[in-house]
A protein has these predicted regions:
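Transmembrane helical elements of multi-pass membrane transporters/channels
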Residues: 23-42, 144, 178, 207-211, ...
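Residue-level signal for short hydrophobic patches within transmembrane helices
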Residues: 14, 18-37, 41, 64-71, ...
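Hydrophobic transmembrane alpha-helices of multi-pass small-molecule transporters
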Residues: 67-70, 182-186, 212-216, 288-291, ...
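Short runs within selected transmembrane alpha-helices of multi-pass transporters and secretion channels
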Residues: 76, 145-163, 174-179, 200-215, ...
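Helix-terminus/linker motif at the lipid-water interface of multi-pass membrane proteins
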Residues: 33, 37-56, 125-132, 188-195, ...
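Transmembrane alpha-helix boundary and packing residues in multipass membrane permease domains
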Residues: 28, 32, 44, 81, ...
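Short alpha-helical transmembrane segments in multi-pass integral membrane proteins
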Residues: 1-25, 83-148, 192-248, 304-370, ...
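Small-residue-rich hydrophobic transmembrane alpha-helices
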Residues: 55-115, 152-171, 278-342, 374-396
């Protein structure tokens, strides 16, 4: 079946690879930055118009909420590889069957996550040693979030379909609308109606539903070839198993990264408020650089998956080389900017008078020296995901985060915050060594899995 490409979707199997990478990555970068704003809106509004206890509860709830959301987003990342591969083959019937399979698997897994969250919320808050005075607020917020998980999944599923077709702009526009809607609803429910933390949670839940509906309507209107119909309602066991495997591995990938960061935070928390503040400021600055690298990885994955699906093996190899050159260059550029402007960016967050300023600058400068490995690693993860070998990015990331956690805890008593930067860099180097070894092995056998 020949695909009639819409104005916003892209046939990525032809044309300039560099141009495709840039056109895919730029909206993804802005999307990641918008996501950072989206994640802080509730805290900002509650901090301004509710009590200190409710503000603290947002922080605790965010730790739990992000773990569940990372599981959903990670799963949809795996589904998007299957979508892009079918799109590259111009087989819309297969794509819609993959979509149905992802919908069934994803909704079942989301329902399980929702039930686990609702049933295990109180024990989890106890494990996190949530203070009694904010536990009720935290539980109230999380209850709304868990109930809105199906809407969050549907939005991410529809957005992954758009990205798989090369239409990354639409997903960005929907996210921008969601950020605006969440901000307005937060002010209405929290400031206007004095709803407190429950009002903020309701605003977030309604925004998730709004995002899913808008994304679905856009798909039906502009990408009818991606929309399910009654004739597509057939499932096979092999397809369900493939969908589950891709979704589960990429979900574990995202969750392992987040859990690793939480464990590193545990090591930092032993050093007192000043060091915690320094680490928080440093990682906030890192977040902007990481948004570029992760967007490059997603763009590489989409571009690779379409061409791999179309059988363009020579072009897949060119995509890897082009992405590696681009991301190494951007990694060097980001490292230079982070190193030179570390004092200025940290000063914006902490000022320059407190005890946290010096450790934050030293941390940011040390970790920046390794950023070329971070960015190069994004090429490998995008490439391997796009060719269907989703286990390799997971294994590399799991190894990286394990090294990062172990070395951070071992070296922190001697090196302080610099131990975390050094452990992070060593983890990136080891992950790249693993992926490079697998790439050399691939070249020797000249084989795609």
């Amino acid at each position: 079946m020949t695909v009639q490409h819409t104005q916003d979707s892209q046939d990525l199997t032809r044309g300039s690879i560099s141009r495709h990478l840039v056109r895919l990555a730029v909206p993804l970068v802005f999307g990641n930055i918008l996501q950072e704003f989206y994640n802080t809106i509730d805290a900002f509004v509650v901090g301004r118009f509710a009590g200190q206890a409710e503000f603290a509860a947002i922080g605790v709830a965010g730790t739990v909420m992000n773990l569940f959301l990372f599981a959903l987003v990670g799963g949809c990342t795996g589904f998007s590889v299957l979508f892009a591969r079918a799109y590259g083959k111009e087989d819309m019937e297969e794509l819609r069957r993959q979509e149905l399979s992802a919908l069934v698997v994803g909704l079942i897994c989301t329902a399980v996550l929702m039930l686990i969250g609702l049933a295990g919320m109180q024990p989890l808050l106890s494990v996190l040693q949530t203070p009694v005075e904010i536990r009720a607020y935290t539980a109230s917020y999380l209850r709304w979030i868990f109930l809105s998980l199906p809407a969050a999944f549907l939005y991410n599923l529809f957005a992954s379909l758009l990205r798989a077709s090369g239409d990354t702009k639409a997903a960005l526009m929907v996210l921008a609308a969601a950020v605006t809607a969440n901000l307005l609803l937060d002010f209405l429910f929290v400031a206007g109606l004095s709803g407190g933390i429950e009002g903020a949670a309701a605003a977030t839940a309604l925004t998730q539903l709004f995002s899913a509906v808008v994304c679905f309507i856009y798909l039906r209107c502009t990408h009818p070839e991606l929309t399910l119909s009654r004739t597509d309602c057939s499932l096979s066991r092999s397809q369900l198993c493939t969908t589950m495997r891709f979704g589960l591995i990429t979900s574990l990938h995202q969750c392992s990264l987040y859990l690793g960061k939480m464990l590193v935070q545990g090591a930092v928390n032993t050093a007192g408020t000043d060091v915690i503040s320094a680490y928080t400021a440093g990682t906030r600055i890192e977040g902007f650089a990481n948004s570029i690298g992760s967007s490059g990885s997603s763009a590489t994955s989409i571009l690779t998956a379409q061409n791999h699906g179309a059988g363009r093996r020579d072009r897949v190899r060119d995509i890897f080389r082009c992405s590696l050159c681009w991301l190494i260059g951007l990694g060097i550029f980001s490292a230079v900017i982070m190193y030179i402007f570390a004092p200025h960016t940290i000063r914006l967050l902490l000022g320059s008078e407190g005890n946290a300023f010096g450790p934050a600058v030293r941390y940011l400068r040390l970790v920046s020296l390794f950023y070329v490995f971070c960015f190069a690693g994004n090429t490998f993860t995008g490439y391997y995901s796009g060719t269907g070998r989703v286990m390799l990015p997971f294994l590399g990331a799991f190894g990286h985060i394990s090294i990062r956690v172990v070395l951070s805890w071992l070296l922190f008593p001697y090196l302080g915050l610099n131990a975390v930067a050094l452990a992070t860099g060593i983890g990136w180097i080891c992950a790249n060594a693993f992926w490079s070894g697998m790439k050399l092995r691939e070249r020797s056998v000249a084989h795609f899995v």
